[in-house]
């Protein structure tokens, strides 16, 4: 039987963003979670839950998603070295502690730790960093302040009020999970009493409220690679929120936001700028200087240059993070009309205008076509 399209499984279009995919998965996971579907409909919900989990695992991974978009299910076939493959109830139980574990009695993030206490991966953090075009092109090293969680100095990480002890959970007997029977099957779920920790704190620490950790801030060195573009993300492994019960910490994602530049606009590896020239230079030609990220460059303006003319400077753009060569710089010509003319200047321009008209020659590439259109319009 052919597998259902992963995008159809989650109910999202093929151009869906990572956030849209995550939201769709959360919605389906909560709808079909075993805790909410028991009895006759449990098997159907179980299958839908597993389908949603498999689709999310594929589409939330950039490399797997790219392979799937290009080759379909064959690109992520486990027999070819990728994909999730078929799962027994071990993988199904593992999914219980996924990204929505907090909804069903766990912590953020998640994995499941065998037959012992539930362990959960910490949540990911995001940080928006603004960089200038010059910094994006050349790369930079920066320091950022991010939240960190350290052992509470009062209870030393136990979560219990000094002088009191942590008790073993009487519901799961310290395992962090309880067994739930569904027909012939037995499925593990997070203990609702201790939320998977396997322990209870009768007298929580007043400083950390029983968490065992306090929130602080730390300075992190970040290397911005040369050529990075707006919207790209840098992953800092292990600098997210802490895990629970010995689980690994989450990651920090630094999202790059490119500041608006006074001169250039970026389009991939190419740069664009508007270059104003006088109408005398446009008519007679000449050499002008144009700005580049590396300094000044010269452009020869041929006589008769029209507004909107585009000049290309090869290799004067940006070398992207995945590019072998830098892009180009495109200079778009605008012709400026002089203002605040003196009487003498006005007289000279009028003489020039009359001289051109008397000559009878067409001095604009669009003039002949425009004149013919006017004659046809007025029936001349």
From Swiss-Prot:
CDD domains associated with the record: DnaJ, DnaJ_C, DnaJ_zf
Stretches with biased composition (Basic and acidic residues): 35-47
Binding site for Zn(2+) 2: 169, 172, 191, 194
Cellular localisation: Cytoplasm
MF annotations from Gene Ontology: ATP binding; heat shock protein binding; unfolded protein binding; zinc ion binding
UniProt cofactor note: Binds 2 Zn(2+) ions per monomer.
CXXCXGXG motif repeat ranges per the UniProt record: 152-159, 169-176, 191-198, 205-212
Pfam families in the record: DnaJ (PF00226), DnaJ_C (PF01556), DnaJ_CXXCXGXG (PF00684)
Domain-level remarks: The J domain is necessary and sufficient to stimulate DnaK ATPase activity. Zinc center 1 plays an important role in the autonomous, DnaK-independent chaperone activity of DnaJ. Zinc center 2 is essential for interaction with DnaK and for DnaJ activity.
Family: Belongs to the DnaJ family.
Subunit structure: Homodimer.
Name the record gives this protein: Chaperone protein DnaJ
Species for this entry: Polaromonas naphthalenivorans (strain CJ2)
């Amino acid at each position: 039987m052919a597998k259902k399209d992963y995008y159809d499984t989650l109910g999202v279009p093929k151009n869906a963003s990572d956030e849209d995919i995550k939201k769709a998965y959360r919605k389906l996971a909560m709808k079909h979670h075993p805790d909410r579907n028991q009895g006759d409909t449990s098997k159907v919900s179980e299958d839908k839950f597993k389908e949603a989990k498999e689709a999310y695992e594929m589409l939330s991974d950039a490399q797997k998603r790219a392979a799937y978009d290009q080759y379909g299910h064959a690109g992520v076939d486990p027999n070819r070295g990728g994909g999730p493959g078929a799962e027994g109830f071990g993988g199904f139980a593992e999914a219980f502690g996924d990204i929505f574990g907090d909804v069903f009695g766990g912590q953020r993030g998640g994995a499941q730790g065998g037959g012992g206490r539930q362990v959960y991966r910490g949540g990911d953090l995001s940080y928006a960093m603004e960089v200038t075009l010059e910094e994006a092109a050349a790369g930079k090293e920066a320091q950022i302040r991010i939240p960190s969680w350290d052992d509470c100095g009062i209870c030393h990480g136990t979560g219990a009020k000094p002088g009191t002890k942590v008790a073993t959970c009487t519901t799961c007997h310290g395992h962090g999970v309880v067994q739930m029977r569904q027909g012939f099957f037995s499925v593990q779920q997070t203990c609702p009493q201790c939320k998977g920790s396997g322990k209870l704190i009768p007298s929580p620490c007043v400083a950390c409220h029983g968490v065992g950790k306090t929130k602080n801030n730390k300075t992190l060195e970040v290397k911005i690679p040369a050529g990075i573009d707006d919207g790209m993300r840098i992953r800092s492994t292990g600098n997210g929120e802490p895990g629970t019960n010995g689980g690994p910490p989450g990651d920090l994602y630094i999202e790059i936001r490119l500041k608006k530049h006074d001169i250039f606009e970026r389009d991939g590896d190419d740069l664009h700028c508007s270059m104003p020239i006088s109408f005398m230079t446009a008519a007679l030609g000449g050499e002008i200087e144009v700005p580049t990220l590396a300094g000044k460059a010269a452009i020869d303006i041929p006589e008769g240059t029209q507004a909107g003319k585009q000049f290309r400077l090869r290799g004067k753009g940006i070398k992207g993070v995945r590019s072998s060569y830098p892009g180009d710089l495109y200079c778009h010509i605008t012709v400026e009309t002089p203002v605040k003319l003196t009487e003498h200047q006005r007289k000279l321009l009028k003489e020039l205008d009359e001289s051109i008209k008397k000559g009878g020659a067409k001095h604009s590439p669009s003039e002949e076509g425009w004149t013919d259109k006017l004659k046809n319009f007025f029936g001349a």
